[in-house]
């Protein structure tokens, strides 16, 4: 049988027992027999039996050990003792411990069965351990008892202070809140065992923040404790809350947190103007909507509670001024509503009201939430430009008005008190034709040139008025002049008329309809009257019929017209209008006599241009145009092909092939310049001109002398002689750089001699040119000095 406990001097123990110890609190030994637990105390054996038969008031669980956490001693902590009734104390029984923490946290004396804790125990990390114990025969290793499981529970002590979940806390509560208004709830937790003692029982209290706030000791709810807290007096509060365990008793652990409480604003302060009277001034020339001044009502509230609405409630300038509210700065801006005049009114008085648009009903007793102030506005005089009365002129003038006639009196005056004299003029940019002028003193607008409605029917001019004493003050007015029509234009044919009459025409046949135009524009409308001119009133050939619709018909009076007798008739027609006075003009109608077929189709007459369109059909005309277009395309194609043909080479009678002489200038082993000579120009030296060309890749330090080369072999047409002349030119040039490559010139023809023309070879010629000065040019010209300097006459360059 197993027995667990802290053993005393008792020797005769039987059955399965468990001893429970509470280190630091109790020292009891309990033996469990048949489900009954009895405490064992140290004493004589004769008293032990009586003790065992005394029943405890409570039952003990045989398979549990309890040990306090956070043991700080230096020796291992004794937990309890395991004992088997098979153990006779001779060391033949070996106790083995296994399970959670065995060998690491807990150890067992394999001989005595004593269990010790060798590490610090923390209930908050682990509250219990489950282990298994076994008794073995030390010699054979055979189990003496079945393996038994037991639990070691860690007994809590108050080793953890309460901790707040969050912090610091931030909260707000409206100002003027009643006492007991909830602000925020804070919560602290204690890691100790809440089921054992008061180690985890937390009590809240305020260390700082009274008498403004209070906290519920059990829930941690913070409430207002003082009535009528005013944000404008104090806005921010710092409250320190303490949470203490052990129910707040002495010796308990405590933690603190900070709660920052802000009083939010309510509309409990009415607006007030800092001044009861404002004095402002404005120029009379201030434009409409310009700012006169600003007023502001102070409100101790903030945000929406400090918003302001300004209005004009009284005064003699309600229709002259406006006030608007600046939503960003809550300022009332007074502006000009109508134009001002110092001469009309010099000052105004306004009563301005500022009010809160957002009110709270529970604070209406603190009102009224509005205030008024008086604004005095003075209008300042300025030197204003002259003002025209009226501000616009409209004048109607007949176009036959005489030059110099007054058509309108323009009037302007100085609005200032000084009433300066006015001088008038016309803005010439508005009257470029200079049709009008204005009297400088009286303002009489007169005509300066004849007016013609048919040319310009409307004139828009600008008249200027300037103060005599202050020319910078200039006013202007627009004058619109409408030129009225008079009957000054005679009617005339609408276009040039040319009629045709057939030889077989009958009397009374219509040959032409005529109409007329008139540049005039009478109010009653145009109406024209047609008749034959007096000299043709009794015309035997043609007659005229007025249709009374501004048109007239020309009719034949007889038949039997003959081209060979007279092929053209001129018929004068008189056209009159209905104006006052009546104007008329004579237009001449040209009538051609033509031969026609029986259907009246013109066949031939002197005006061939009119016969063709009549005799040709539309299809024939299209065919003719198509043929003309095709011919034009063919001509353009032929011209284009001829331009693209290559010109044949001109070969003289001897069939000599002309080549080009190409000169290559090589320096440093590379071709730098190429000069090509057209052999056609060199073929006839009499006509060719010698052109000296300088090298473009090198400029001498000293300006080159004029290189004139006599025209050698002018009478010789052989190219060989021309090349010799070029060689001579190279020899005579003092500044020409040498060509270090062999120049080959090829010429196919009779008598061609190919020789070296290299400038290096020219040293061997009979030229008297000396190159000794090259030695004085420095190391850069050393190579040239060696090549062109004085050498042994017996030596050869190549």
From Swiss-Prot:
Q: Which GO terms describe its biological process?
A: adherens junction organization; calcium-dependent cell-cell adhesion via plasma membrane cell adhesion molecules; cell migration; cell morphogenesis; cell-cell adhesion mediated by cadherin; cell-cell junction assembly; homophilic cell adhesion via plasma membrane adhesion molecules
Q: Which Gene3D superfamilies match?
A: Cadherins, TCF3-CBD (Catenin binding domain)
Location(s) in or outside the cell: Cell membrane
Q: Where do transmembrane segments lie in this chain?
A: 619-639
* Glycosylation sites recorded in the entry for this protein: 47, 260, 419, 460, 541
**Amino-acid biosynthesis recorded as keyword:** no
Q: What residue ranges lie in the Extracellular compartment? A: 59-618
Its cellular-component GO annotations read: adherens junction; catenin complex
Q: Its membrane topology, per UniProt?
A: Single-pass type I membrane protein
Q: Does the keyword Metal-binding apply?
A: yes
Disulfide cysteine pairs (residue numbers): none
The record ties this protein, via SUPFAM superfamilies, to: Cadherin-like
In this UniProt entry, which residues form the Cytoplasmic topological domain(s)?
Answer: 640-798
Annotated propeptide span(s): 36-58
Q: Name one GO molecular function term.
A: beta-catenin binding
Domain comment, as recorded? Three calcium ions are usually bound at the interface of each cadherin domain and rigidify the connections, imparting a strong curvature to the full-length ectodomain.
Q: What does this protein do?
A: Cadherins are calcium-dependent cell adhesion proteins. They preferentially interact with themselves in a homophilic manner in connecting cells; cadherins may thus contribute to the sorting of heterogeneous cell types.
From the Swiss-Prot or TrEMBL record, give the protein name.
Cadherin-20
Q: What is the lineage of its organism?
A: Eukaryota, Metazoa, Chordata, Craniata, Vertebrata
